[in-house]
Amino acid sequence: MKKFFKITFAALSLVLLAGYLIPERKAMPCCRPSDYNHQSFWHWPWTRGEAGHPHTGVDIFGKVGTKVVSQTGGIVLFAGEYGGKAGNGVVVLGPKWRLHMYLHLHTVDTKAGKFVRPEEQIGTLGKSGNAAKTPAHVHYGVITPIPYVWRLFQNEGTCNPPVWFNWRLMFWLDPADHLPSK
């Protein structure tokens, strides 16, 4: 029994390590690098009123129907109506075990379980969810399921949210670090 646990632990460790060894590319999901504000990540409050929350991604603006591509290769974990404020969305598990989220899409052109290559079309830019009254855009966010504990006491973004929001910084990564610079 002890040998089984050692082998299982070793195998899981190798799988986890392999995910970190896969290189990550920097590609725009749509439009141009000048079509997003790289300082909008963790801007607070993003919604009206003090009960708002920090912005957990960057919004890349363009025309409705513009092609949206996967920033990285990976496995599509979710594709469809995300619900609530997010509207139509796609979630891709990419290198380093990071989840790449594409929300407010007009159409979703992939399906869960599919492997996508970098720059493969996954949908079109839109105004779904709570983006109906805003200019068309894709909300691009990056999450790590493995917490970055050292980020707990960091403040990022253009406004400093209350400290009780900082636990989210351990999981939400700045998408601008994954996109080409302007």
PLM regions and their residue ranges:
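A broadly tuned, weak detector of single residues within folded domains
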Residues: 67, 112-113
